[in-house]
A protein has these predicted regions:
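Loop-to-transmembrane helix entry
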Residues: 1-9, 102-106
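Alpha-helical transmembrane segments of multi-pass secondary-active solute transporters
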Residues: 2, 32, 103, 125, ...
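Residue-level signature of mid-helix packing/kink "hotspots" within the transmembrane helices
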Residues: 10-18, 115-116
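Helix-to-loop junctions at the C-terminal end of transmembrane segments
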Residues: 16-29, 126
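Residue-level hotspots within transmembrane alpha-helices of multi-pass secondary transporters
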Residues: 18-22, 120, 147
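C-terminal transmembrane helical hairpin of 12-TM major facilitator-type secondary transporters
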Residues: 30-88
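A late C-terminal transmembrane helix in Major Facilitator Superfamily
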Residues: 96-131
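Multi-pass alpha-helical transporter architecture, strongest
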Residues: 139-155
């Protein structure tokens, strides 16, 4: 059952990958990234804050509710993450005064750094506190990335 959160996250990313381009065409990349990041990060964080205490009770009903809430949180996080990288790549290519190749290279370096630093920081926080607290860090990072996405230019 614990793998269901990863399955929800992955399924959400697949669905969102097929719909994100249409949403960005209709509403603009800045709005999609902002709302995806802020709402996805907030739901993910809230699901952890609510579900973890619920799961620590002896009640089967509470454990099932906690499982459903965690899956909703991971699903929301997956949907919020997907449009970010393509939108930031396109945005980096449109920065005035910077060649598109340089902007894209910078975003790629930031992405690779996040790939290595994100899990490392999450693990460090987990060692210092506990795993539910550590999972608040990526939720916060998703919210920050969503806010940073407000600077994207749609035209």
């Amino acid at each position: 059952l614990t793998a269901s959160a990863f399955a929800s996250f992955s399924l959400s990313m697949i669905i969102s990958r097929f719909t994100a381009d249409a949403l960005m065409d209709r509403f603009g990349a800045a709005k999609v990234v902002f709302y995806g990041g802020v709402v996805g990060g907030a739901i993910w964080s809230a699901s952890i804050l609510i579900a973890v205490p619920l799961s620590q009770t002896a009640s089967q009903t509470n454990n099932l509710l906690a499982l459903v809430l965690i899956n909703i949180g991971f699903f929301a996080a997956g949907a919020g993450i997907v449009p970010m990288f393509p939108a930031f790549i396109v945005g980096a290519a449109k920065v005035p005064g910077i060649p598109a190749s340089l902007g894209i290279a910078r975003i790629s370096v930031i992405s690779i750094a996040g790939y290595f630093l994100g899990p490392t920081v999450t693990g460090l926080i987990s060692e210092l506190t506990n795993l539910p607290t550590a999972f608040m860090y990526p939720g916060l990072a998703l919210i920050v990335a969503g806010i940073a996405g407000r600077g994207l230019r749609d035209k």
